[in-house]
């Protein structure tokens, strides 16, 4: 499945137009309904590496597909207490080879479903995930480790997960394994999908 060139004609998010001066892990806040949540990202200063942290038009198109998948279970409470998450695996030849979404609490997250569909084609591919991959053992194993074990080369994350059990840990694990990570692709839309989740986690945290 290949995206047409027309789907790449999307504008780059304004907050990614800024050019930082060095590699750094930062936090920023986003206000909603009187509450704030923290999102962790990594920015790279002016160099050949800088473009790697900026979502491309193709990245945005694939992320929008992942967002659409995340809405499959239904309304905001359909996966309660978990967030709604979608994942798309794209091969080096720009083909979608796996897709998945989290259907409900207690079942696998989006990433394992997408990786299962991709099989061996996941090796060297890019994973588009609407929310930072989890990094802890709960009802399921860490999705960050599943991506590593599958041989994923690059991960594009829609928005960080403010859950104290994750909160940057998934991104850190992926980077430690040598995987390129881009954070903040279609961030606003990814936030809106799980607005209730973000508010609840922030309030309880």
What role is predicted for each listed range?
Residues 196-205:
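Phosphate/diphosphate-binding glycine-rich loops and adjacent basic-rich segments that engage nucleotide
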